[in-house]
């Protein structure tokens, strides 16, 4: 039987994406030709707008868009190719690569599941305590391995805890526990440089070390976690008085598992103590990255994980996105675009209270991340606002860190963050339930982040 050809939704979307790319190219050409500013500023503004549109619409994959940054910089004569690609070898990329390698080794040897399971037994079958411990270990593990991997690992444990409850009668409890897993993973990732890509982007931009980030990252987690969980509790009103059975997790301590644990603990201790260690040896540049690279070599050489395991567990696209964001920052500075934007934004916001500026920025980042990759948001906004911060009377470090943390605080939509998407994909959460709880957290966290930036920003 003959059927007429009807464009599928993906085909129509492909047409829309192609149209966006074509219009974006035309806009870039128009800006280069007709903007009335200095030619170099025109180039900087053109590249910024061109890349921003592609990142925000995802008309091209965000990684491909990141690779367009050095390409445009070279073609338009801002940098030569060597200079354009310099930031793709930034030490922060290798630091984050070390985090991927550690996660690969823990997963390969089953130690991630073991640690989670053992902590759960401390609850002694009480659902309330079990949930608190579950959220705590989720946040703690998310500091060291990706929040995506952490959520994927902890979700089965959470579902197992709820297995004996009636999902209809105990709907609020299901929503509280499962959303709590996703939100704990996102919040926990704020704590360290390797916890979430936006952290590394801000750190690379501002030259923040591993220990320096933890000095405020961990306290922020300690503040946001109880606030977030308490607010989620008030919104959902779960019943946590049940008793549950938790399956025992046993593991044979083979040589490989012992070596994996030793590498993990050694790396964490060295990262935490990197500043005093560096000072003791007269100042070792980029010690955090050296530690990460040592961990990668130790993991593969000791055969606790193969190179293929590390390779498959590494999100190379995220690393390329780092490079694109850092190169964009260099372009804005070299072309004078940052100074140009600073003078104009400062004129517009010259009479605005600093807290209002921080509040507006936090709200913009949080709600933008609901629709755009948090990594892409940070890669775009950190270079832009770091360049205009001083003109607005705000420390560039404070503004960059606020953007990075805000990019991890989008809780309303499944597409906002990988943890949200994983929990939603389990089939146990409806989107309207996530939107109701997430909206409350978004609003409260926006205010909290602005307050923290305003009152505690001096420690940065």
Predicted regions and their residues:
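Membrane-core helix-loop-helix motifs of multi-pass transport proteins
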Residues: 10, 165-238, 245-250, 422-452
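Membrane-embedded alpha-helical segments and adjacent helix-loop junctions characteristic
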Residues: 9, 13, 50, 64, ...
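Helix-coil boundary and interhelical linker segments in multi-pass alpha-helical membrane proteins
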Residues: 206-212, 386-397, 458-460
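Hydrophobic transmembrane alpha-helices of multi-pass small-molecule transporters
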Residues: 1-95, 212-343, 441-442, 446, ...
């Amino acid at each position: 039987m003959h059927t007429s050809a009807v464009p599928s939704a993906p085909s129509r979307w492909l047409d829309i994406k192609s149209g966006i790319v074509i219009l974006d190219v035309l806009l870039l050409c128009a800006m280069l030709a007709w903007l009335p500013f200095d030619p170099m500023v025109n180039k900087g503004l053109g590249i910024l707008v061109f890349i921003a549109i592609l990142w925000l619409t995802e008309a091209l994959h965000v990684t491909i868009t990141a690779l367009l940054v050095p390409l445009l910089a070279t073609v338009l004569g801002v940098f030569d190719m060597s200079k354009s690609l310099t930031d793709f070898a930034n030490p922060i990329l290798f630091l984050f690569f070390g985090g991927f390698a550690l996660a690969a080794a823990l997963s390969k040897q089953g130690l991630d599941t073991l640690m989670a399971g053992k902590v759960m037994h401390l609850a002694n079958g009480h659902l309330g305590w079990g949930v608190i411990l579950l959220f705590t270990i989720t946040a703690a593990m998310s500091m060291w391995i990706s929040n995506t991997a952490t959520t994927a690992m902890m979700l089965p444990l959470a579902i197992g805890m709820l297995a004996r409850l009636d999902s209809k009668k105990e709907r609020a409890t299901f929503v509280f526990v499962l959303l709590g897993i996703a939100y704990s993973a996102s919040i926990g990732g704020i704590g360290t440089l390797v916890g979430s890509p936006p952290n590394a982007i801000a750190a690379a931009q501002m030259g923040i070390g591993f220990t320096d980030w933890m000095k405020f990252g961990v306290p922020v987690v300690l503040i946001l976690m109880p606030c977030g969980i308490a607010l989620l509790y008030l919104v959902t009103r779960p019943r946590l008085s049940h008793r549950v059975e938790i399956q025992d997790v046993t593991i044979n301590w083979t040589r490989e598992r012992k070596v994996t644990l030793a590498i993990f603990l050694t790396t964490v201790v060295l990262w935490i103590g990197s500043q005093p260690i560096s000072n003791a040896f007269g100042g070792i540049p980029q010690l955090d990255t050296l530690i990460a690279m040592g961990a990668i070599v130790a993991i593969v050489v000791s055969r606790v994980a193969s190179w293929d395991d590390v390779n498959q567990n590494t999100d190379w696209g995220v690393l390329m996105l780092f490079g694109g964001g850092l190169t964009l920052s260099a372009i804005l500075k070299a072309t004078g675009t940052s100074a140009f934007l600073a003078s104009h934004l400062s004129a517009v916001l010259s009479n605005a209270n600093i807290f209002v500026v921080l509040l507006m920025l936090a709200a913009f980042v949080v709600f933008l991340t609901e629709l755009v990759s948090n990594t892409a948001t940070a890669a775009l906004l950190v270079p832009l606002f770091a360049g205009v911060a001083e003109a607005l009377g705000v420390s560039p470090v404070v503004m960059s860190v606020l953007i990075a943390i805000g990019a991890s605080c989008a809780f309303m939509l499944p597409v906002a963050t990988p943890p949200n998407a994983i929990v939603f994909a389990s089939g146990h959460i409806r989107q309207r339930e996530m939107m109701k709880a997430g909206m409350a957290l978004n609003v409260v966290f926006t205010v909290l982040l602005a307050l923290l930036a305003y009152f505690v920003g001096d420690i940065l």
